[in-house]
């Protein structure tokens, strides 16, 4: 059976667990509409992504 050779230090254990934390999502302000959106995602109101129209605009 595999057994660790050395005890894991609290510092190393904490560094390993730091990736498990829940991080809040980041938002950026859209240049054209001023709406908040996720980075690298399209704007659902305008249907634009990277300056191109990829979806038809929603009619309100």
Curated annotation (Swiss-Prot):
Keyword terms, alphabetized: Ribonucleoprotein, Ribosomal protein
Keyword rRNA processing attached: no
Sorted alphabetically, which Gene3D superfamilies does this protein's record hold? Answer: Single helix bin (1.20.5.640)
Q: Per its UniProt record, what InterPro entries does this chain match?
A: Ribosomal_bL32 (IPR002677), Ribosomal_bL32_bact (IPR044957), Ribosomal_zn-bd (IPR011332)
Among the GO molecular function terms of this UniProt record, one is: structural constituent of ribosome
**Top-level taxon:** Bacteria
- Which GO BP annotation is one of this protein's? translation
List the biased-composition ranges (Basic and acidic residues): 17-44
Quick one: where's region Disordered? 1-60
Return the GO cellular component terms, semicolon-separated.
large ribosomal subunit
List where Basic residues composition bias occurs: 1-16
Can the keyword Ribosomal protein be found in this entry's annotation?
yes
By sequence similarity, the record places it as follows: Belongs to the bacterial ribosomal protein bL32 family.
Q: Which NCBIfam families match?
A: rpmF_bact
Which HAMAP family does this UniProt record tie to the protein? Ribosomal_bL32
Q: What is this protein called?
A: Large ribosomal subunit protein bL32
